[in-house]
Amino acid sequence: MAQSRDTGNPFPDSGELDNPFQDPAVIQHRPSQQYATLDVYNPFENREPPPAYEPPAPAPAPLPPPSAPSVQSSRKLSPTEPRNYGSYSTQASAAAATAELLKKQEELNRKAEELDRRERELQHVALGGAGTRQNNWPPLPSFCPVKPCFFQDISMEIPQEFQKTVSTMYYLWMCSTLALLLNFFACLARFCVDTGSGSGFGLSMLWLLLFTPCSFVCWYRPMYKAFRSDSSFNFFVFFFIFFVQDVFFVLQAIGIPGWGFSGWVTALVVVGSKPAVAVLMLLVALLFTGIAVLGIVMLKRIHSLYRQTGASFQKAQQEFAAGVFSNPAVRTAAANAAAGAAENAFRAP
């Protein structure tokens, strides 16, 4: 407009006014030609060229998982942690299978020991036989004129499941013998301080000399042979005689005065006048009591084992009859008696 005023033409060329965007102020803010429309124009766009592409660094290799311990360490599960019931059942099944295998292994070992024992017994019989087998009990020195009377080997002759029972009965017999020996010394000590107790001292010597061999022969050996050969007859002999022996064990523990037993009653009678002798007698009474209790327990235990073996009174009768008729002396005596009876019958008028 200022230019028009200078030229003096109030009506400038219409071509200059046809395009209103020719104004310099508008041209200055016109967008560049690289954008076709205003819709794609971004005034905040960075016109600098993008940086060159760099490939990402490779990720580090994952570490190998730690080896699981052979036994899973016990830990307390959190309340929100789910329980692994599947693994528990698997572990329980594995534990049950392991226990079953161990049980079968123990049974196989027991059978192997039994077979080994039988094999050694057969070898022993094949080499010398039962007739030439040397007796080893009682274990006497070689220079002693009295030789052993019995052969005893619990590990070889007794089955594996009964060896502990037979060994316990053998120790019971040894303890009863020791108690009778101590009872003899206690009665001797009392006789030394009281000469009026001579009858008790004499009976204590008799019990020592009588019960020691008789108990071994009458109830221990039948019990040993019963378990060795599963003999019902020997079981019945043992039950009868050992029951009587248990009664004597109880009487020994009671200690009736004048019977030759240093039991509780006799020890309490002496405790007031002879304290030193009473102490020894109380120890013997305590030993008698323990033997009586153990004897009753073992009698009940052996009876339960006897019932498990399938033995019976009929079987005992059959064994007794077979043993009697297989004895050469019995057969000879029976034949002589029959021949004598027949001869007398023919001679009778």
Curated annotation (Swiss-Prot):
Membrane topology type: Multi-pass membrane protein
Ranges of biased composition (kind: Pro residues): 49-68
One cellular-component annotation, GO: Golgi membrane
Residue numbers spanned by region Disordered: 1-90
Phosphothreonine found at: 37
Pfam families: SCAMP
Location of this chain's protein in the cell: Membrane
Residues carrying Phosphoserine: 32, 74, 78, 87
Function, in words: Functions in post-Golgi recycling pathways. Acts as a recycling carrier to the cell surface.
Subunit composition and interactions: Interacts with NEDD4 and NEDD4L and TSG101. Interacts with RNF126.
Name this polypeptide is given: Secretory carrier-associated membrane protein 3
